[in-house]
Design a protein with these regions (language model features):
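Acidic/His/Gly-enriched intrinsically disordered linker/tail segments
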Residues: 1-57, 61-63, 79-80, 96, ...
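Alpha-helical scaffold segments
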Residues: 195, 225, 251, 255-271
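Beta/coil-rich, acidic/histidine-enriched accessory regions frequently appended to metallopeptidases
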Residues: 81-242, 270, 274-278
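Short alpha-helical "patches" and their helix-cap loops
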Residues: 12-23, 67-78, 214-216, 244-247, ...
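HEAT/HEAT-like alpha-solenoid repeats
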Residues: 222, 241-252, 279-284
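Long, low-complexity regulatory tails in eukaryotic proteins
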Residues: 261-293
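Short inter-helical turns and helix N-cap capping residues of alpha-solenoid HEAT/ARM repeat scaffolds
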Residues: 158-159, 189-190, 219-222, 250-257, ...
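Extracytoplasmic/secreted proteins, especially bacterial periplasmic and envelope-associated proteins
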Residues: 1-4, 50-58, 67-74, 84, ...
């Protein structure tokens, strides 16, 4: 129900993406020795909350929204403020819909594994997830065979997560071969897509330096921090320039940008050596817990 409340606020795409990430975590944990059986004692918190949420999502899809809501209402009216079990709830479901509760329990409540095929089938009801999964299926293909497809998705898809996945798939592609992608991101105002480029770009091409500097002006402290570090490490000739630009940055409550700046400034040769003693004292001061995030 917390996820449903978020769905009302943030929309279907957010809701389905949360379900997708839950499914990935549950699938991974179900392959370990940990107890991922919902209907048991000693299961992990991931099992109780996230696999349990998935079980309810599946149930709601199987019996329909109206029947699900009726079953929940009847259940609460009948058992409010009482100690009850899952079986009582399933009986209420059976009273409003012809439902095989034994089969549901076996597949979703007493099973160590996670039915990823059914999960993917349900997730594909959302257009964003459908396009995202189509894109993921192309991860192993050579760039030359999917370049036009990726560029079309990047420039036309309305979905932020999909655009990010495109950027992740070009992380090993030389700049000369993917120039259109780099240029598109440089001119984009989507913070998350720009952040994805900063995350994956291990070396800043000479032709992209000026465009890359614009990431320092992004409305994301994380993007700014990554861009500052990358330019400082990769372009010694620009160290003083980017430090001057970022000297008044603070960042999150944990002072991530200020602390990063101090560390880089202290490690930079011939950069205000007369101020370094004070900078070092300031950096020491940020070690106190009041600056922890």
């Amino acid at each position: 129900y917390a996820s449903l409340a978020e769905r009302d606020i943030y929309g279907d795409d957010y809701f389905y993406w949360e379900l997708y990430e839950m499914a990935e975590k549950i699938q991974k944990e179900s392959k370990t020795a940990k107890n991922t059986v919902v209907y048991s004692e000693g299961a992990t918190s991931l099992t109780y909350y996230e696999k349990g949420a998935w079980a309810l999502f599946v149930l709601r899809n199987q019996i329909g929204d109206a029947n699900f809501q009726t079953a929940v209402k009847n259940y609460l009216d009948k058992y409010g403020f009482k100690n009850v079990s899952t079986d009582e709830f399933l009986k209420e479901v059976e009273s409003v819909y012809s439902f095989n509760s034994d089969k549901f329990k076996k597949e979703w409540l007493t099973n160590q594994s996670f039915d990823i095929k059914q999960a993917v089938f349900l997730l594909k009801n959302n257009p964003m997830i459908q396009q995202y999964l189509e894109l993921v299926d192309k991860q192993a293909l050579p760039f030359s065979s999917k370049k036009e497809y990726l560029l079309n998705v990047l420039t036309t898809s309305p979905y932020e997560k999909v655009k990010q996945e495109v950027i992740y798939q070009i992380h090993n592609v030389p700049y000369e071969e993917a120039k259109e992608f780099y240029d598109y991101v440089a001119n984009s105002d989507n913070v998350k897509v720009r952040q994805a480029m900063v995350q994956v770009l291990k070396e800043i091409p000479n032709e992209y330096v000026e465009a890359y500097k614009t990431f320092l002006d992004d409305g994301s402290y994380l993007t700014q921090e990554m861009a500052l570090k990358n330019i400082w490490y990769q372009r010694p000739d620009l160290k003083h320039q980017v430090l001057d630009k970022s000297k008044n940055w603070e960042g999150f409550n944990d002072k991530n940008l200020r602390i990063t700046w101090l560390m880089l400034a202290l490690a930079t040769d011939n950069y205000y050596p007369e101020k370094k003693a004070n900078w070092y004292k300031e950096l020491e001061g940020y070690a106190y817990s009041k600056y922890n995030s």
